[in-house]
Regions:
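Bacterial Sec-dependent N-terminal signal peptides
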Residues: 1-44
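Beta-barrel outer-membrane channel/assembly domains of diderm bacteria
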Residues: 43-139, 166-170, 251, 260-272, ...
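Flexible, solvent-exposed coil segments and beta strand-coil junctions
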Residues: 68-71, 105, 142-149, 180-192, ...
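Outer-membrane beta-barrel translocator domains and adjoining extracellular loop/strand segments
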Residues: 69-76, 113-119, 148-155, 189-198, ...
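Short Gly/Pro-enriched turn/cap motifs at secondary-structure boundaries
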Residues: 80-81, 156-158, 199-201, 248-249, ...
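Outer membrane beta-barrel
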Residues: 82-188, 208, 212-216, 221, ...
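Internal metal/ion-chelating core segments
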Residues: 176-272
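Extracellular/periplasmic loop regions
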Residues: 276-377, 441
Length: 469
């Protein structure tokens, strides 16, 4: 019996040893698997390269319609107009680390018009960038800085704005510093090859410095801007140049100022101030000194994400008298200093009323009495995908006028946007201008007393192809 018990104990010990041995084997095996598995996964991730190249093709189709009456210095038979306009953009993008290439072709035409009203390369540029924030860009670029008051795309004008340029800069750690260099030439001009009067923008040369800083842990952004713009002076036809009194030449004007954006919760305060100096030129006229300025302030209050309110004031300096052509003109007062501020290349319809009676559509004889714009409005999203806005403008000249009141009129704007999907949006709007006798005298058109304008825009912008490798 003892022998049998001893035998059973030996067998039990052997079984326990085997179990212990097997347990150790399984422990070692699982440890190895757990150790190898992540390593294998990491090795696999290392072997599969992250896509370095990306190509995107997209289409931007704009169908735009307008019906207007009044607002422009035209005869009674041209006082009303209705038309439909189409704009097609084909957009191509290529990206890889350190390089981006962007091209946009644009076709613009009025429906029913034979041929194309405009077909051009709206944008075409290449941008080289480094990991430390420095970059260089060359080509035709649609520029947009700050609130677009001085430099913007002005996209509502359908043809929009772009510039042929070289841009270098730095972006990082809250700092943005850009330097822009432009030089335009007209290859059809074989006489001295200096005059430039057609192209992306109407200037000979432009140099721009822009700096922006976002304060850390504080809702404040500050920008500084300096521009030096060379405009061609003299007659367009070189054969008519008078080298003794009015030769072809380039005159320069400067723009400098700043923009501030303070945006705590539920409130955004914006302010800007700019000055213009240098020389103002016009065809067949001597250059005049420029002493102009503008200032603006705007508050946007958003109690919730669903609605908000705006209130603000713009002041653009103006001339006291009409300009006089070179050589003088009997009965007109000669003045050598231009005080009328020019917004240059900004998105003008964004600030002084979407119809923009004052800068897109100039006064008679180019007279610029300046502008005061007091505005108040509201915006909101009453239902999903629908945005609505209402804005009132009180408009007046900046300078006092002889025998006329400064008040130009009152403008009411109503707008709505409906987003059918992420790439389909319908916008509609209506503007009513209640002009005064001052507006009529400056525009020389009685129809400005009751200018009205309704419009719609349908934008379809799908991405048709996208790939990475």
């Amino acid at each position: 019996m003892q022998t049998q018990n001893l035998y059973l104990n030996i067998i039990t010990m052997e079984i326990d040893k085997k179990k212990s041995f097997n347990s150790k084997i399984w422990h070692i095996l699982w440890s190895t698997i757990l150790f190898i598995s992540p390593t294998g996964t990491w090795a696999q991730n290392d072997s599969v390269k992250t896509p370095q190249n990306e190509i995107d093709f997209s289409i931007n189709l704009l169908a735009h319609g307008e019906a207007c009456g009044g607002g422009l210095p035209k005869g009674a038979e041209e006082n009303k107009s209705r038309f439909l306009l189409g704009r097609m953009r084909i957009i191509a993008d290529y990206k890889r680390p350190g390089l981006q290439v962007h091209a946009v072709t644009q076709n613009l035409a009025i429906w029913g018009m034979k041929g194309n009203q405009a077909f051009n390369l709206y944008e075409g540029w290449a941008k080289i960038s480094s990991k430390n924030g420095f970059f260089a860009q060359v080509g035709r670029v649609a520029l947009s800085y700050d609130d677009e008051r001085i430099i913007g795309t002005n996209d509502f004008a359908t043809a929009a704005l772009s510039h042929d340029l070289i841009r270098v800069g730095y972006e990082g750690h809250g700092h943005q510093a850009h330097a822009i260099f432009c030089y335009n030439q007209n290859d059809n001009n074989i006489y001295n090859n200096t005059y430039y009067d057609d192209g992306a923008q109407y200037y000979k040369t432009m140099q721009t410095l822009w700096y922006h800083y976002d304060f850390p842990k504080f809702p404040l952004g500050v920008s500084l801007l300096f521009m030096n713009i060379g405009m061609q002076a003299g007659k367009i036809n070189p054969k008519e140049w008078d080298y003794d009194t009015n030769p072809a030449r380039t005159e320069y004007q400067q723009m400098f100022g700043g923009y501030i954006n303070y945006h705590p919760k539920h409130l955004t305060l914006e302010a800007s101030y700019y000055r213009q100096t240098g020389k103002q030129v016009a065809i067949s006229m001597n250059a005049s000194d420029i002493r102009a300025w503008m200032a603006s302030v705007k508050a946007t209050i958003t109690p919730t994400d669903r609605y908000g309110f705006i209130v603000g004031y713009d002041h653009l300096s103006g001339d006291d008298y009409m300009p006089v052509p070179y050589g003088g003109d009997i009965g007109l007062i000669r003045h050598d200093v231009v005080k009328g501020f020019s917004p240059l290349y900004g998105s003008r319809t964004k600030f002084y009323g979407i119809l923009d009676f004052f800068y897109e559509s100039a006064y008679i004889n180019g007279f610029t009495p300046g502008l005061q714009n007091v505005f108040i409005g509201a915006f909101g999203d009453p239902v999903k995908k629908l945005s609505c806005s209402f804005t009132y403008h009180y408009l007046a000249t900046a300078t006092a006028l002889t025998n006329l009141n400064r008040t130009l009129g009152h403008s009411i704007e109503i707008g709505a946007d409906y987003r059918f999907s992420k790439d389909i949006t319908l916008s509609i709007g209506y503007t009513q201008m209640f002009g005064t006798e001052t507006m009529c005298r400056l525009k020389q058109d009685e129809s400005n007393k009751n200018g009205r304008w309704g419009w719609f825009s349908l934008v379809i912008s799908p991405t048709v192809f996208s790939t990475k490798w």
